[in-house]
Amino acid sequence: MENLELQKVANEVRKDIVTALHAAKAGHPGGSLSAADLFTYLYFEEMNIDPKDPKKADRDRFVLSKGHTAPGLYSVLAERGYFPKEDLVTLRHLGSYLQGHPDMKHIPGVDMSSGSLGQGISAAVGMALSAKLSNDSYRVYTLLGDGEIQEGQVWEAAMFAGARKLDNLVVIVDNNGLQIDGKVEDVCSPYPIDKKFEAFNFHVINVADGNDMAQLRAAFDEAKTVKGMTTAIVMKTVKGKGVSFMENQVGWHGKAPNDEEYAQAMADLEKVGEALCQK
């Protein structure tokens, strides 16, 4: 799929995110929106997957380590055809299979339940090691938040991945600079992120704009050429990307839009869509 078409899909994913959160009246828009382009690139371009056979043995695996941004994952899964888009508005509702964090037992396309920060990357490392031991060809991708990497478990997993030279694993960090309590650098700075992963024998790819499809494509194309090292892609993004009043605002880490805010958010995204159609 061409980059422009991927951008259009990502904009639809953002609309789905906002719509689901508005219906839920709770959840995490900021980090879901910042990673919408990444979700789109993975599921529409990068990964070997089949929505009609979500458990096929040779599929690539994805683990959402920052599990609170499940609305982003659910939205791209729906757009990709894993389940009906209409189900997105049941997010967090009693009896819905789409709860606040991913559940691998109930949601088609989810490879790992996640939510407790730091555990997702550990699971992804285990999947990658399993593939190596079984001589399987699938690749494993995991997405972490920059606030999440304050968790010590992240670095235990990174140490193991680097030591085992798991070149079938790609660790992605959504570096949007904000977490629930404020700026990541003020709460407990993990910077420079790239140097830390390099210290654990990772091949590191810095992406200046993780909301740009061309830059994401270049990063993942490079990752596929790396042998004998795990790859970390550290992408700078905008928290709340696409919605004017949410962008770079820490208050939108974990708050759903009310009716007025929802209308404004959808108007913003409609304008983005119109601009993309004119290109």
Describe each model-derived feature in a short phrase.
Residues 17-20, 32-163:
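Cofactor-binding active-site loop characterized by glycine-rich and histidine/acidic residues
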Residues 9-26, 174-176:
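N-terminal capping segment at the start of a domain
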Residues 25-33:
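Structural motif
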Residues 80, 187, 247-251:
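Short secondary-structure boundary/capping segments
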Residues 68-69, 73, 176-177, 236-240:
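Glycine-rich beta-alpha junction loops
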Residues 109, 113-116, 121-225:
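Thiamine diphosphate
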Residues 1-5:
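Non-catalytic, mobile gating and regulatory segments of ester bond hydrolases
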Residues 213-279:
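Glycine/aspartate-rich loop-and-adjacent alpha/beta segment that forms the canonical ThDP
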